[in-house]
Amino acid sequence: SFAESHAIPLYAVAVSSGPGSYTGLRIGLSTAKGVAYARNVPLIAVPTLQLITVGPLLYDDDMPDDALLVPMIDARRMEVYAAVYDRALHTVREVGADIVTADTYREWLDRAPVYFMGDGAEKCKAVIDHPNARFVDNVHPLARHMAPLAERAFLEGRFVDLAYFEPFYLKE
């Protein structure tokens, strides 16, 4: 293999675990499981919504310490899959399917600056008019942004069962 012929050590395989496209998650997970199994290394599942936050966290030097991050994936109509995290990526609110209205995120907007990002954030721009609302454009889950999340999971020993792990679809 390329990795073996170039003496590149492989200690684990990381994969985006969802939510997201059913087909995309299945293909990605099948590939990751195959590589992890063939190389006899552990599998790391990285939540897609956390993955979306990495770019803004790495490149926005002006983001205040008390900022909250709301990564979003467009579901359909006015629905998004979203979670709320603090800057350390601690979960403030678990992943859920939200109908976007002017009040959907008011609880957090009234407390701190809230950064909306991901392909679902465009829906919020049209309906949320709050001084703490910040919209980060053109943010997508990128493989290169998976590295810091996967490294943290690796160091903490957070691996998933290679045989039985399933993607998180949120909705079947």
Please state what every model-predicted region is.
Residues S1-P19:
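N-terminal beta-alpha supersecondary unit
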Residues F2-H6, A38, P56, M146-F154:
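Stable alpha-helical structural segments in soluble proteins, enriched in small hydrophobic residues
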Residues A12-S16, G24, L68-M72:
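Short glycine-aspartate micro-motif
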Residues S16-T48:
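DPxDG-like acidic metal-binding loop motif
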Residues I27-T31, T101, L142-M146:
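Catalytic-loop motifs flanking and including active-site residues across diverse enzymes
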Residues P42-P141, Y169:
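Surface "functional belts" at beta-alpha junctions
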Residues R134-E172:
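Acyltransferase
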